[in-house]
Amino acid sequence: ALIGDNGAGKSTLIKVITGVHRPTSGQVSFKGEQVVIKSVAQSRKMGIEAVYQERALCDQQELYRNIFAGREITNAFGFLKIKEQRKEAEKILRDYIGFTSKAITVDSTVMGLSGGEKQGVAFGRSLYFNSDLIVLDEPTMGLSIQETEKVLNFVRGLKDENKSAIFIDHNIIHVYGAADRFIILD
């Protein structure tokens, strides 16, 4: 877990790790090797995914479109394979996120979901793309107590999936039960 007060640089660090910003000094190591991450696409190819505090979802779009935004499944000619995206999105909703209610389908729009459900979609997307490292930027921000507990259970479950996570927050109570190690940014 990476903990620090507002303005300590937590979100900036996330953006360096995920390729949004290039560092002005220092080094980034991943899997024991020094790396230079020049873009979001490169960090994704390396196996790094991010779940941002704003969740990076499009409210007006259906869940299947949100899950595959920017990484659509296409055929050899570049045409979208909508049926396959919908089928894979159903798997993600059921198997990765645990949505079993018929009220939430791949055609549901994000704006109709609760904060925790939106966070679940963002988590499912990060797991589907076979990430080795999931960077979580204040994933419990603005969530109810029950939704926060679901998020914390998800983070705890990453160990069972042999995934690593950087859980960034300013609330030590949220990260205490989910993290193995703590770094405090001051």
Regions found by a protein language model. Give the residues of each.
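Glycine-rich phosphate-binding loops of nucleotide-dependent enzymes
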Residues: A1-D186
